[in-house]
């Protein structure tokens, strides 16, 4: 467990929260960007973060951890490795070399598409889907839909950060996907 400068133990979730940098007005005015690179640069913070996810899923009898392009690729393979399960990448369109299934979803301005290899998992496989952050929930919902089309059971959506004011975690839960996030930030 991390300790404060006085030597007192810190709550792991509070410690993770404290390691995330906020960058105002990036990538556009009015946005408060939650930057996980500072968390990833700290070996102690990264270990605590991975341990939180592993503790949550160690008894979930998973077959795979799916990660969403691009920042979901950072944490999901580490968690998969620690759980001794496979990693499934869900990528932006045109990035996977083999036969794929695709799913489009709406963004605030426009739309996007993600893809998965058609043989990434089998019917009945138990999967969690991970990303760094849940904002509107569109990417995670599209990833969940892809996994379900392959017959997988999507056990839960997981992320480091929730931005509840943007409604994504509520949207996912209302659609029947349980959601776990380590911490949350108010606002955008």
Swiss-Prot record:
Q: Indicate the principal place this protein occupies in or around the cell.
A: cytoplasm
Asked whether the keyword Protein biosynthesis is assigned, the reply is no
Reaction(s) the record says it catalyses = AMP + diphosphate = 5-phospho-alpha-D-ribose 1-diphosphate + adenine
Any idea which UniProt keywords this protein has? Cytoplasm, Glycosyltransferase, Purine salvage, Transferase
PROSITE patterns on file: PUR_PYR_PR_TRANSFER (PS00103)
Give the PANTHER family listed for this entry. Answer: ADENINE PHOSPHORIBOSYLTRANSFERASE (PTHR11776), PHOSPHORIBOSYLTRANSFERASE DOMAIN-CONTAINING PROTEIN (PTHR11776:SF7)
* Molecular functions per Gene Ontology: adenine phosphoribosyltransferase activity
InterPro entries named among the record's database cross-references: Ade_phspho_trans, Adenine_PRTase, PRibTrfase_dom, PRTase-like
**Protein name as it appears in the record:** Adenine phosphoribosyltransferase
User: What family does the entry list?
Assistant: Belongs to the purine/pyrimidine phosphoribosyltransferase family.
| Pfam families from the UniProt entry | Pribosyltran
Assembly, in brief, is: Homodimer.
The subcellular location is: Cytoplasm
Pathway annotation: Purine metabolism; AMP biosynthesis via salvage pathway; AMP from adenine: step 1/1
Q: What class of enzyme is it?
A: transferase
Task: Report whether Lipoprotein shows up as a keyword of the record.
Answer: no
| A GO biological process held by the record | adenine salvage
What this chain does, per the entry, is described as: Catalyzes a salvage reaction resulting in the formation of AMP, that is energically less costly than de novo synthesis.
